[in-house]
Amino acid sequence: MAYSARLRKAVGAVRATLSAVELCDVQAPEFAQHGDHAVAADAPLVLVACSGGRDSMALAAVSHIVCTSMGVRCGAVIVDHGLQAGSERVASEAADRCRALGLGPVIMRNATVQARGEGLEAAARQARYDELCAAAHESGAIAVLLAHTMDDQAETVLIGLLRSRGVDALAGMPQVFTRSGATFARPLLTLTRAETTGICEDLGVEYWDDPTNGDAVDGELPNDYPLRSRVRHDLLPAIERFAGFNVTRHFAESARLARMDKEYLDQRSDEVMGEAVAAVDRPASSAAVSTDAPRACVAGDTNDSGHGIGLMIGVKRIAREPEAIRLRVIAHALSQAGVNASAAQIAAIDRLVVDWHGQGGVSLPRGYSANRKKHVIRVCQDGAHANR
């Protein structure tokens, strides 16, 4: 069959993404030559995360085409969250459609969603990734492909700006990332939802429409719909009407540029963190502590009870950096210590670096606090500050 322009675009996007995850390194040599070749039973495996919707069914179909041409097995993993009536049937039908396309293995997983403080959407996402990671590890898959499109990227930027701020909010979703040791990739970030719908039509692929997307609802969606659905159904179209141009593409391109900035800032912050921050969690020892060189404290800067202090930040080193790097170093260090600090708390610790005049410490979640003594900021649970 002759490929449509959108199908050719999708094939190119999937092939480029597989190259980005270094799949070319494992391609069988004969598949570089023209002709029909059978994919070996022990060939590397790529999994497509499939919900049965139009985006993931289009990705499943295109990925099978591309993987087969590269000598790579293409399977699917389908996660049933059990949050909607009939979800088991939807998952089963998605599995049948993937098998009909030639994907294999087709892995079915049941997720247990336990909503806590983060809300149901976030809990479902966490449960889904847990199952996807488990499926990748158990099957030996070298990558899991996700079907997020340009529309999803634009929605993610708006959601990020509503919930957060700064370049991280603008950066959207990365094309390739790792989670719990599994590699994930998003090949369709350059394609629109209209294009994935068209690809399903081109290939005669059936799909399921999630009712929580609100596509069939006239007027604004009620507040009990998921935030992403409301952004998709109401906010993006309203911005587009106001702006008079394709804001989906505009936001997606902004995300691509912001991600380049974010990746540089993260890289630079990691370099500074390696020089300025020491994590301390070992048993007590008699090691001397230098207030000017926090890395000398790794051997065991503790209180009398033998509990580690958590973190030490070298003020002289971090003070030489611009504010953007300082704030990032502090935030990353706290995150690695399991402390989820607010922007105001991070800024207050930064003032201990650049505007210290003997002020008291900064209270942090989980009973932690940050206190400065000479040229070192110590971040620890409150009891560990004793006798410092």
From Swiss-Prot:
GO terms for cellular component: cytoplasm. Its EC number is 6.3.4.19. Gene3D superfamilies: HUPs (3.40.50.620). It is found in: Cytoplasm. It catalyses: cytidine(34) in tRNA(Ile2) + L-lysine + ATP = lysidine(34) in tRNA(Ile2) + AMP + diphosphate + H(+). It comes from the Bacteria. It is an enzyme of class 6 (ligase). One of its GO terms (biological process) is tRNA modification. One of its GO terms (molecular function) is tRNA(Ile)-lysidine synthase activity. Keywords: ATP-binding, Cytoplasm, Ligase, Nucleotide-binding, tRNA processing. NCBIfam families: lysidine_TilS_N. Ligates lysine onto the cytidine present at position 34 of the AUA codon-specific tRNA(Ile) that contains the anticodon CAU, in an ATP-dependent manner. Cytidine is converted to lysidine, thus changing the amino acid specificity of the tRNA from methionine to isoleucine. Belongs to the tRNA(Ile)-lysidine synthase family. This is tRNA(Ile)-lysidine synthase.
